[in-house]
Amino acid sequence: MDREPLSSGRLHCSARYKHKRSASSSSAGTTSSGHKDRRSDYDYCGSRRHQRSSSRRRSRSRSSSESPPPEPRHRSGRSSRDRERMHKSREHPQASRCIGVFGLNTNTSQHKVRELFNKYGPIERIQMVIDAQTQRSRGFCFIYFEKLSDARAAKDSCSGIEVDGRRIRVDFSITQRAHTPTPGVYLGRQPRGKAPRSFSPRRGRRVYHDRSASPYDNYRDRYDYRNDRYDRNLRRSPSRNRYTRNRSYSRSRSPQLRRTSSRY
């Protein structure tokens, strides 16, 4: 009578233990399957990302291979096409009412130029290019006609003729705007470490070079400037003066030391 409830109790405990193991195994299976699913999803997404990045790289490489290489630029910043276009415009300028007369004699006056070109049509104005320093003609001028046909006729008729012993060249002007007078002096940026021609670094004054001066005078000026610069360096550097003072002091004391040593 007593053994029956014990067997039934043992059976109940074993059933509960089996139920727990089955539940734990099922949960472990779900977690493992969940991990597997996550890994598979990650692998799928990673492969898709890899495919996208590789396709982007291919498209970039194709676009870079298809695009032409950049044009080499000149020191002035202009490309080769711009320089070719400018060269062509200089060789074959467009027809305009302004013509340029080049190769003139520096003694040819504006009045003579007007008499020469006035027979082809009414002239609006003549601009002689004058040197600012010498106040003389630089050998070319610009003539503005009122009509384009008159400017074309003057160009075709007067190009190559001889005026005051010089054969002139007539062509259309490259620029369509009014020409500004040239100052006769270089107005660009000066290179580093160099002063303008008319400026002397010594005492900051202007020096006017005389062509009749002898080479000895130039040598003397350079020698004086070198001595002045050496004196300024001596005055500015105290360490060099200290060294010279110590050296003179040692020279003055050296004979006395020798005499005292000889006594003993």
Curated annotation (Swiss-Prot):
Residues 23-33 have a biased composition (Low complexity). The modification Phosphothreonine is found at T180. Residues 71-85, 207-234 have a biased composition (Basic and acidic residues). GO terms for cellular component: precatalytic spliceosome; spliceosomal complex. Keywords: Developmental protein, Differentiation, mRNA processing, mRNA splicing, Phosphoprotein, RNA-binding, Sexual differentiation, Spermatogenesis. Residues 97-175 form the RRM domain. The modification Phosphoserine is found at S40, S212, S214, S254. Transmembrane segments: none annotated. Pfam families: RRM_1. Extensively phosphorylated on serine residues in the RS domain. Isoform Tmaj and isoform Tmin are expressed in males and females. Isoform msTmaj and isoform msTmin are present only in male germ cells. SUPFAM superfamilies: RNA-binding domain, RBD. GO terms for molecular function: identical protein binding; mRNA binding; pre-mRNA binding; RNA binding. Changing R138L: In pm1; loss of female-specific DSX splicing. Loss of male fertility. Residues 13-22, 47-61, 191-206, 235-250 have a biased composition (Basic residues). Residues 176-196 are annotated as: Linker. Belongs to the splicing factor SR family. Required for female sex determination in somatic cells and for spermatogenesis in male germ cells. Positive regulator of female-specific splicing and/or polyadenylation of doublesex (dsx) pre-mRNA. Splicing requires an enhancer complex, dsxRE (dsx repeat element: which contains six copies of a 13-nucleotide repeat and a purine-rich enhancer (PRE)). DsxRE is formed through cooperative interactions between tra, tra2 and the sr proteins, and these interactions require both the repeat sequences and PRE. PRE is required for specific binding of tra2 to the dsxRE. This is Transformer-2 sex-determining protein.
